[in-house]
Amino acid sequence: MALLYLDPFNKVVKTAAGDFKFDDAIFMGHHQAADLVWKLGAVGKTADGKPSNWAAVHPQFYNMKDDPNVFVIGDSVGAVSPQFGHYPKSGHVANRMGRSVAQYIGQQAKGQPMTPVMIDNLCYMLVNTEPLEAISVKFDYKMGPEGHLLQTVTDDIFRRPQLWQEDLRWYGQMVKDFTGG
């Protein structure tokens, strides 16, 4: 949906589809792979030969098709499946990709073939503070019979405090992974 005009004072956004009032909103600009990916020449091409704006990588190993020793993870990764397109652009996905790439590099260093590691994605949404309530969505991936990644989505929309606590544990693990602590 193309943004025509944003009025943050009156909290109205105007689009080709109409005007929408909002209480709170997050607006995100155009996304694309990081500058380094462009400089490396790792951006893929669309069917008509134009830049895809995303790194062209193997859908399971995240390495470049032209150089299997160069890996790209996280938000810069392009489409990996005809079923769902891109992995979600999330910290959880980048974390899981990073873990699996570390394993792949270790396997390469030992002269072993890379063994695919199927990542997942998990997103908690803290929806209320009084009482504490959260919901979640989980994405699982597997290789389909035709050699394409398949995605299964599980929505957990039953609001409850246990999911809030699970989110805090998840966050703690992400911090440990990030800091090495």
Residue ranges and their predicted role:
Residues N53-V72, V117, V127-G147:
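FAD-binding beta-loop-beta segment adjacent to the flavin cofactor pocket
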Residues H92-I119:
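Internal hydrophobic alpha-helix adjacent to the cofactor/substrate pocket in enzyme cavities
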Residues M1-K11:
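A conserved short coil-to-beta-strand element within the FAD-binding core of flavoproteins
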Residues L3, K14-D19:
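A structured beta-alpha segment of the ubiquitous adenosine-cofactor-binding alpha/beta core
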Residues H30, S81, Q103-G106, K110, ...:
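Hydrophobic alpha-helix feature that most strongly marks membrane-spanning transmembrane helices
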Residues K21-D24, M28-A94:
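FAD-site-proximal beta/loop scaffold in flavoenzymes
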Residues A134-G181:
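C-terminal auxiliary extensions adjacent to catalytic cores
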Residues F84-M97, C123-K138:
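Short, electropositive alpha-helical surface patch
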